[in-house]
């Protein structure tokens, strides 16, 4: 049976070795500790005590959508989690750029942005979506370091050869001869690849269009994201009708890992391992493929007793749609900031609920129960338990 642990901080807020739930209950009952975090459950001692610590290794399995982490000692696993990152960041950034550009056009005069790009001013510049994921990796590792006395961090740093993924037999000069060699432009190559016929209805002798399967903002102009369609099928897609065709394989995750792998290692001052070693060790231990198991193997786990993993979900901290246009204009986001915000944890009577939104000028609040039932209550009857700070921890029991 997997054990549940309670994490402990000393009087100065520095991490100690975790204890059992029974010992935590005794300390809380005797007034020797206080609760400072509900999930993962963490207490802080109010008395001086011995600070014996064991060497702890943290294994990190980085990723584009998910992060696996596992902290182990020589005998047992102390913490395990799989973090699910936000997936709508690129779309939200595109929407923000669109609104910013529209705002510039509505003003009487705005100095042009000629030659003042951030990219040319700062070394090590990263795209906002890439920087967000890199900072999310660093943030979750620093959070675990504030909860456990970590001595060593090991990160799996992989380099992906995208051309090798597309064509496993590629070698030598073939790297310099791409699929578009000897073609005038992308459109000419796509039409030739599709044999100058519609990929949907297979018509040839008609007007042909080159269509983006995914938007240019998210899918780019690469040939794999383009498909040949006749004028009729293209109009159907424009009107919102679905047409079946093979969607291209995305290499965003591989590109992302190639960009951030050394930045992540340098930021966390970590040791490095590689994917083929992780795969070999995982097979030797007969463990199923998962992010938490990969992190356990990366941390050099062998026969340590495992703990219940946490599922961590990254949430949006500001929702721009909550601010309504009730006064004839749209004020700045959260200008009238209420004490409670979405995803906060509150107590109503004996029930622990999550905040959905605050309305009626801060007098009422919408709450969501564990069965996703939304209820409406007066805000005066609500007691705050925990602010949502971007990450939501759920213990898998």
Segments the model singles out, each with a brief description of its role:
Residues 19-51, 179:
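Charged, flexible boundary elements
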């Amino acid at each position: 049976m997997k054990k549940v642990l309670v994490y402990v901080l000393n009087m100065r807020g520095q991490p100690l070795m975790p204890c059992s739930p029974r010992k935590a209950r005794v300390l809380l009952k005797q007034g020797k500790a206080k609760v400072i975090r509900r999930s993962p459950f963490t207490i802080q001692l109010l008395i001086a005590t011995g600070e014996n610590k064991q060497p702890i290794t943290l294994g990190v399995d980085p990723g584009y959508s998910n992060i696996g982490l596992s902290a182990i000692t020589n005998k047992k696993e102390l913490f395990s989690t799989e973090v699910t990152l936000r997936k709508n960041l690129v779309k939200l950034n595109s929407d923000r750029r669109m609104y910013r550009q529209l705002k510039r056009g509505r003003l009487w005069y705005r100095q042009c942005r000629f030659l003042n790009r951030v990219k040319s001013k700062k070394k090590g510049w990263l795209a906002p979506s890439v920087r967000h994921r890199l900072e999310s990796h660093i943030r979750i590792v620093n959070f675990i370091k504030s909860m456990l006395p970590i001595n060593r961090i090991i990160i799996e740093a992989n380099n992906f050869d995208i051309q090798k993924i597309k064509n496993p037999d590629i070698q030598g000069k073939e790297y310099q001869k791409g699929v578009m060699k000897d073609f005038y432009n992308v459109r000419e190559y796509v039409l030739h690849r599709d044999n100058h016929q519609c990929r949907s209805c297979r018509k040839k002798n008609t007007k042909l269009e080159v269509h983006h399967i995914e938007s240019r903002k998210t899918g780019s102009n690469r040939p794999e994201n383009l498909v040949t369609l006749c004028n009729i099928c293209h109009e159907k897609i424009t009107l919102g009708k679905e047409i079946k065709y093979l969607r291209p394989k995305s290499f965003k995750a591989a590109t992302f890992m190639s960009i951030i792998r050394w930045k992540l290692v340098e930021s966390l001052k970590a040791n490095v391992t590689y994917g083929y070693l992780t795969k070999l060790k995982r097979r030797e231990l007969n463990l199923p493929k998962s992010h938490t198991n990969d992190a356990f193997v990366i941390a050099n786990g062998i026969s340590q007793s495992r703990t219940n993993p946490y599922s961590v979900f990254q949430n949006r901290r500001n929702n721009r749609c909550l601010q309504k246009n009730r006064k004839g204009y749209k004020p700045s986001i959260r200008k009238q900031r209420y004490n409670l915000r979405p995803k906060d944890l509150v107590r109503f009577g004996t029930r622990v609920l999550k905040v959905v939104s605050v309305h009626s000028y801060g007098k009422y609040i919408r709450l969501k129960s564990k069965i996703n039932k939304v209820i409406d209550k007066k805000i005066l009857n609500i007691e705050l338990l925990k602010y949502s700070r971007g990450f939501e921890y759920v213990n898998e029991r």
